[in-house]
From Swiss-Prot:
Record's keyword annotation contains Transferase: yes
Stretches with biased composition (Basic residues): 25-37
Catalytic activity: cytidine(1402) in 16S rRNA + S-adenosyl-L-methionine = N(4)-methylcytidine(1402) in 16S rRNA + S-adenosyl-L-homocysteine + H(+)
Similarity field: Belongs to the methyltransferase superfamily. RsmH family.
InterPro entries on file: RsmH, SAM-dep_MeTrfase_MraW_recog, SAM-dependent_MTases_sf
Record region (Disordered): 1-46
Keyword rRNA-binding carried by entry: no
Protein's UniProt name: Ribosomal RNA small subunit methyltransferase H 1
Source organism of the structure: Lachnoclostridium phytofermentans (strain ATCC 700394 / DSM 18823 / ISDg) (Clostridium phytofermentans)
Gene: rsmH1
């Protein structure tokens, strides 16, 4: 009997219902401040349809609302693609669906679009978002597929009149700490675009040699401190300390750069973290191999006179796209390619700082 009373008291103390007691109603935690900082606190920003005023205020400040992605170079893309009603198009990187939505508007309910994405989390949200805007399966086909496999889509769809590939990571992926893309917030060191496939960045670091890691940092992000960072990471893991969170990697990089003059240290750590995370993301997602495959197959999915625009966000991607377009133009496969990159306007960069590193290149099928 005494034991039963103890158990009953324990239940009361822990908030669990006793046998003759109704379950305790727990209110959800509410953010009490006026300036939400964490991803979870920014619940209004993650519901743009419900809190349009909040979204507009965030954008006006030059920030990207949490859980959203502001499409880049929309006007430049549409001006080049010259989409006409009745055409067939492909958005090879669906993401938040902003570019797809604008291209669908150009079709004026005539023709069809296909859109691809590897992210199983965001693709569900984007499909629903576009469906609610009136873009259902009669005008839009969405597939969870890596854009390296565009040849599989053309078997079903036929040749495309226009293709877009935006190679950037979407803001909603970067901003969600659970995805582990950003060094600014604590989260698992994952960096996979599809968390259901492959190994995380944390797992990758457990098995990589110093030489291989240094080479990765150089090739994927031109990291000037590649030797020091790779040595520190490998030594830390050899000591039995896992680097399995974004914060652990950021703190280790900070220690490596401790000898940099104090007035330069903060910016140096920020830039080095950006480059290191980028290099790891490219590696775990095989981004260069995927891009090689896409560029190689691209001419075979374009109709005669078909147009393709590609947005890149770092020099490694841009070099691959430029080289492919120029080589295929010399081979007579493309009739025209962009001589130079197209960049977002200063106004767009002020409105959306994440657009600053964007470069756009285009090609037309002969």
């Amino acid at each position: 009997m005494a034991d039963q009373n103890i158990n009953k008291n324990e239940k009361v103390l822990t908030g669990q219902p006793t046998e003759n007691q109704e379950p305790v109603h727990k209110r959800r935690e509410r953010y009490k401040g006026t300036h939400p900082k964490t991803f979870k606190e920014k619940y209004k920003e993650r519901q743009p349809e419900k809190y349009a005023d909040t979204i507009e205020k965030v954008i006006q400040k030059g920030s990207t609302p949490a859980g959203m992605h502001i499409s880049i170079c929309v006007n430049e893309i549409l001006e080049f693609l010259q989409i006409k009603p009745g055409q067939k198009g492909l958005d090879a990187t669906l993401g938040y669906g902003g570019h797809t939505r604008e291209m669908l508007k150009c079709l004026e309910s005539q023709g069809h679009m296909y859109a691809l994405d590897v992210d199983p989390i965001e693709i569900v949200k984007t499909r629903e978002r576009l469906q609610n805007l009136g873009f259902g399966p009669e005008i839009l086909t969405i597939k969870q597929l890596n854009f390296a496999n565009i040849d599989e889509v053309v078997e079903e769809a036929g040749l495309f009149d226009f293709v877009l590939a935006d190679l950037g990571v979407s803001s909603m992926q970067i901003d969600d700490p659970d995805r582990g893309f950003s060094f600014k917030t604590d989260g698992p060191l994952d960096l996979r675009l599809n968390p259901e496939k492959g190994i995380s960045a944390a797992e990758r670091l457990k098995t990589i040699s110093q030489t291989e890691l240094q080479g990765m940092l150089l090739e994927n992000s031109d990291e000037p401190y590649s030797e020091e960072i790779s040595k520190a990471i490998v030594n830390e893991i050899k000591r039995g300390n896992e680097i399995d969170t974004t914060t652990k990697l950021r703190d280790l990089i900070s220690k490596v750069l401790v000898t940099i003059p104090e007035n330069e240290q903060k910016e140096a750590i920020k830039k080095t973290c950006q480059r290191t995370f980028q290099a790891l993301r490219i590696d775990v997602n095989n981004e260069y191999e995927v891009l090689y495959s896409f560029l190689e197959k691209l001419p075979n999915v374009l109709a005669k006179g078909g147009r393709v625009a590609i947005l890149t966000f770092h020099s490694g991607e841009d070099r691959l796209v430029k080289k492919s377009f120029k080589n295929l133009q010399r081979a007579g496969i493309y009739s025209e390619v962009s001589d130079d990159v197209i960049r977002p306007s200063a106004e767009e960069c002020n409105r959306n700082p994440r657009a600053r590193s964007t470069k756009m290149r285009w090609a037309i099928k002969a």
